[in-house]
Amino acid sequence: MSERLLEVSGLACRRGPALLFESIDFTIEAGTALCVRGANGSGKTTLLRTVCGLTRPDAGEVRWRGAARGEAFRGELLYGGHAPAVKDELSAEENLHAALGLAGAEVPRDRMHAALTDVGLFTRRALPARRLSQGQRRRIALARLILDPAPFWVLDEPLTALDDAAQALLLRTLDAHLARGGAALLATHHDLPLANDRVRQLRLGA
């Protein structure tokens, strides 16, 4: 039986007077992903931010490896928001190096160059991010996924602005992450062609 990593029980969140969701319960085991689906405004991003500890719930509990979230959880978390978290004045390589450094991941330059090659940014690695297209900026985050050893990924619409080749690479990267015992929580409008025993669905606002 796979290790139970994340446990969510009785989670509820409001936006002002409006109830986004309530009584949300789920678990995520090692080697599995949970995809959160729902219409715009149903609370998908709020749910992800609440699990990460970025938004306070109105009710409920989130536990990591059987305990309350703390430094250990933050050290094992990779959060990718809806917008690419890049600094315009830094180059693609500098943004990647900074993101990995903040996560405490020491990655040799040759491995960073290999990841930038995989995502099609090696020849643009020295360009300031402000000169990159939206899709190229998203590829910096994809390079981080290739390199970051964090076991738990929380990704908000990770396929947005990626072309077909980059989407395929992201799915291969996610599949490899799950195969080595990682886990993921994703909000996405896309169907993810992963093995049925690795991915489950949670629909909000149904």
Spell out what each predicted region is.
Residues 83, 88-104, 111:
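Q-loop/switch helix immediately C-terminal to the Walker
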Residues 52:
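Helix-to-loop junction immediately C-terminal to a conserved catalytic motif
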Residues 89, 128-135:
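Conserved ABC ATPase signature
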Residues 57-75:
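Conserved ABC transporter NBD signature motif
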Residues 97, 109-124:
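Conserved ABC ATPase "signature" region
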